[in-house]
Protein backbone atom coordinates (compact mmCIF):
# COMPACT_ATOMS: atom_id res chain seq x y z
CA UNK A 1 0.00 0.00 0.00
CA UNK A 2 1.03 3.56 -0.56
CA UNK A 3 2.11 5.17 2.68
CA UNK A 4 4.15 2.26 4.06
CA UNK A 5 7.59 3.77 4.62
CA UNK A 6 11.05 2.55 5.56
CA UNK A 7 13.11 5.03 7.61
CA UNK A 8 16.85 5.40 8.14
CA UNK A 9 19.59 7.93 8.78
CA UNK A 10 22.59 8.55 6.55
CA UNK A 11 25.62 9.84 8.43
CA UNK A 12 27.99 12.10 6.54
CA UNK A 13 31.02 12.02 8.86
CA UNK A 14 31.92 10.18 12.05
CA UNK A 15 31.59 13.41 14.02
CA UNK A 16 28.26 13.76 15.85
CA UNK A 17 26.87 16.45 13.61
CA UNK A 18 24.16 16.75 10.98
CA UNK A 19 22.90 13.74 9.09
CA UNK A 20 20.15 12.88 6.63
CA UNK A 21 16.82 11.38 7.63
CA UNK A 22 15.49 9.26 4.76
CA UNK A 23 12.02 7.79 4.28
CA UNK A 24 11.19 5.57 1.31
CA UNK A 25 7.69 4.47 0.32
CA UNK A 26 7.78 0.71 -0.28
CA UNK A 27 5.33 0.69 -3.18
CA UNK A 28 6.07 3.87 -5.13
CA UNK A 29 9.77 4.17 -4.10
CA UNK A 30 9.06 7.86 -3.38
CA UNK A 31 11.87 9.28 -1.27
CA UNK A 32 11.69 11.96 1.44
CA UNK A 33 15.03 13.32 2.65
CA UNK A 34 15.55 15.83 5.45
CA UNK A 35 18.75 17.32 6.80
CA UNK A 36 18.67 17.07 10.61
CA UNK A 37 21.13 18.61 13.10
CA UNK A 38 22.11 15.32 14.77
CA UNK A 39 21.21 11.65 15.08
CA UNK A 40 19.08 12.05 18.21
CA UNK A 41 15.53 10.79 18.74
CA UNK A 42 14.46 14.40 19.37
CA UNK A 43 15.79 15.60 16.00
CA UNK A 44 14.22 12.64 14.18
CA UNK A 45 10.81 13.19 15.80
CA UNK A 46 10.93 16.93 15.11
CA UNK A 47 11.64 16.27 11.42
CA UNK A 48 8.89 13.62 11.26
CA UNK A 49 6.32 16.04 12.67
CA UNK A 50 7.16 18.42 9.81
CA UNK A 51 6.98 15.62 7.24
CA UNK A 52 3.57 14.50 8.53
CA UNK A 53 2.16 17.93 7.73
CA UNK A 54 2.74 17.22 4.02
CA UNK A 55 2.71 13.42 3.66
CA UNK A 56 0.42 10.60 4.79
CA UNK A 57 2.26 7.73 6.49
CA UNK A 58 0.35 4.51 7.29
CA UNK A 59 3.23 2.53 8.75
CA UNK A 60 6.93 2.92 9.32
CA UNK A 61 9.70 0.30 9.44
CA UNK A 62 12.91 1.27 11.23
CA UNK A 63 16.11 -0.34 12.38
CA UNK A 64 16.87 -0.59 16.09
CA UNK A 65 18.99 2.56 16.29
CA UNK A 66 18.53 4.82 19.30
CA UNK A 67 17.41 7.63 16.98
CA UNK A 68 14.19 5.65 16.37
CA UNK A 69 13.55 4.73 20.01
CA UNK A 70 10.83 7.37 20.45
CA UNK A 71 8.82 6.94 17.24
CA UNK A 72 5.77 6.18 19.40
CA UNK A 73 5.77 9.88 20.37
CA UNK A 74 4.84 10.67 16.75
CA UNK A 75 3.09 7.53 15.42
CA UNK A 76 0.52 5.09 16.75
CA UNK A 77 2.60 2.20 18.19
CA UNK A 78 0.60 -0.28 16.06
CA UNK A 79 1.99 1.42 12.92
CA UNK A 80 5.66 1.07 13.90
CA UNK A 81 7.72 -1.96 12.88
CA UNK A 82 11.33 -2.63 13.82
CA UNK A 83 13.62 -4.72 11.64
CA UNK A 84 15.66 -7.49 13.24
CA UNK A 85 19.19 -6.50 14.31
CA UNK A 86 21.76 -6.78 11.49
CA UNK A 87 18.98 -7.49 8.95
CA UNK A 88 19.26 -4.52 6.59
CA UNK A 89 17.53 -6.56 3.85
CA UNK A 90 14.28 -6.11 5.80
CA UNK A 91 14.46 -2.46 4.73
CA UNK A 92 16.01 -3.09 1.34
CA UNK A 93 14.24 -0.31 -0.55
CA UNK A 94 15.57 2.29 1.86
CA UNK A 95 19.10 0.86 1.81
CA UNK A 96 19.16 0.96 -2.01
CA UNK A 97 18.01 4.58 -2.01
CA UNK A 98 20.68 5.45 0.55
CA UNK A 99 23.21 4.08 -1.93
CA UNK A 100 21.80 6.51 -4.54
CA UNK A 101 22.33 9.36 -2.07
CA UNK A 102 25.98 8.30 -1.75
CA UNK A 103 26.45 9.03 -5.47
CA UNK A 104 26.07 12.71 -4.61
CA UNK A 105 27.31 12.73 -1.00
CA UNK A 106 30.12 10.19 -0.56
CA UNK A 107 31.05 9.08 2.96
CA UNK A 108 33.16 11.70 4.67
CA UNK A 109 31.40 14.66 3.03
CA UNK A 110 31.95 17.41 5.59
CA UNK A 111 28.82 19.47 5.13
CA UNK A 112 25.85 19.68 2.83
CA UNK A 113 23.11 22.21 2.22
CA UNK A 114 19.32 22.05 2.22
CA UNK A 115 19.50 22.97 -1.48
CA UNK A 116 21.72 19.95 -2.23
CA UNK A 117 19.41 17.65 -0.23
CA UNK A 118 16.40 18.97 -2.20
CA UNK A 119 18.30 18.37 -5.47
CA UNK A 120 19.09 14.75 -4.49
CA UNK A 121 15.50 14.10 -3.38
CA UNK A 122 14.19 15.49 -6.68
CA UNK A 123 16.73 13.46 -8.69
CA UNK A 124 15.77 10.20 -6.94
CA UNK A 125 12.03 10.87 -7.30
CA UNK A 126 12.41 11.52 -11.04
CA UNK A 127 14.74 8.55 -11.70
CA UNK A 128 12.96 5.80 -13.73
CA UNK A 129 12.81 2.42 -11.98
CA UNK A 130 12.52 -1.00 -13.61
CA UNK A 131 10.26 -2.22 -10.76
CA UNK A 132 7.83 0.61 -11.61
CA UNK A 133 7.75 -0.34 -15.30
CA UNK A 134 10.31 2.41 -15.99
CA UNK A 135 8.22 5.13 -14.41
CA UNK A 136 9.81 7.43 -11.88
CA UNK A 137 8.38 7.42 -8.34
CA UNK A 138 6.82 10.82 -9.04
CA UNK A 139 5.17 9.55 -12.27
CA UNK A 140 3.97 6.42 -10.44
CA UNK A 141 2.26 8.55 -7.79
CA UNK A 142 0.63 10.73 -10.44
CA UNK A 143 -0.78 7.60 -12.12
CA UNK A 144 -1.88 5.96 -8.83
Regions found by a protein language model. Give the residues of each.
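Mobile genetic element proteins and their domesticated derivatives, centered on retroelements
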Residues: 8, 23, 29, 48, ...
